[in-house]
Amino acid sequence: MAKIRQKTKRAAAKRFSITKNGKLKRKHAYRSHLALGRSTKAKRHLRKDAIMSTSDTKRYTQCL
């Protein structure tokens, strides 16, 4: 008989990806609209992916 496994949470799978070292990569918030007041430098930094903190990584790896 096959083992029961936890299903992948599709909402989490669409938002996070796992790096080679097991860390979680995510996109920055505050990118969609109302960016006129932000400087070009701030918007450029938001374009890059962010690495999730280790405490959150433990919680979200179970969802993936």
From Swiss-Prot:
InterPro entries reported in the protein's UniProt record: Ribosomal_bL35, Ribosomal_bL35-like, Ribosomal_bL35_CS, Ribosomal_bL35_sf
Gene for this chain: rpmI
Name of the protein in question: Large ribosomal subunit protein bL35
Example of a GO biological process term: translation
HAMAP family tied to this protein: Ribosomal_bL35
A single Gene Ontology CC term: cytosolic large ribosomal subunit
UniProt xrefs under Gene3D superfamilies: 4.10.410.60
UniProt keyword Ribonucleoprotein present: yes
Protein family according to the UniProt entry: Belongs to the bacterial ribosomal protein bL35 family.
Organism (species): Ureaplasma urealyticum serovar 10 (strain ATCC 33699 / Western)
Swiss-Prot/TrEMBL keywords: Ribonucleoprotein, Ribosomal protein
Domain of life assignment: Bacteria
Gene Ontology terms for molecular function: structural constituent of ribosome
